[in-house]
């Protein structure tokens, strides 16, 4: 394991709480006006996926920290969960990069980006939620 990962005891309660927060954020995304706020929708999608991946890590008994931790969580998912296609992993990584540009450079996303990626992002979110629920049983 990498030095950015800390081995911990699996934490089901924290994972449940993160799952609940992600589901609340997903509900909120449905209310975002994509014509006016596509960048906000993209950021929120990324936050949901990042949180769900961190819940998977928690259930596997890991935490990440430090510079590049988000990138490492995506790599962890790619290496350890083959149910995610290369295309899906690439979409998550693209979204991570885009979210950083939005947050740090004031970059604006076009509505078209969100509508083109929505199906893939929903698929990733569905897989992550299913995985977490299975691990919580």
Describe the residue ranges of each PLM region.
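Terminal alpha-helical segments
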Residues: 1-137
């Amino acid at each position: 394991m990498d030095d950015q990962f800390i081995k911990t005891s699996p934490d089901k309660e924290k994972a449940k709480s993160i799952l609940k927060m992600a589901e609340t954020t997903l509900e909120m995304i449905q209310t975002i006006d994509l014509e006016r706020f596509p960048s906000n929708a993209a950021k929120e999608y990324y936050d949901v996926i990042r949180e769900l991946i961190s819940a998977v890590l928690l259930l596997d008994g890991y935490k990440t920290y430090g510079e590049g931790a988000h990138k490492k969580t995506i790599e962890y998912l790619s290496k350890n969960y083959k149910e995610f296609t290369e295309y899906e992993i690439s979409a998550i990584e693209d979204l991570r990069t885009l979210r950083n540009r939005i947050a740090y450079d004031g970059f604006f996303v076009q509505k078209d980006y969100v509508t083109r990626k929505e199906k893939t992002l929903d698929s990733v979110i569905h897989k992550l939620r299913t995985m977490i629920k299975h691990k919580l049983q």
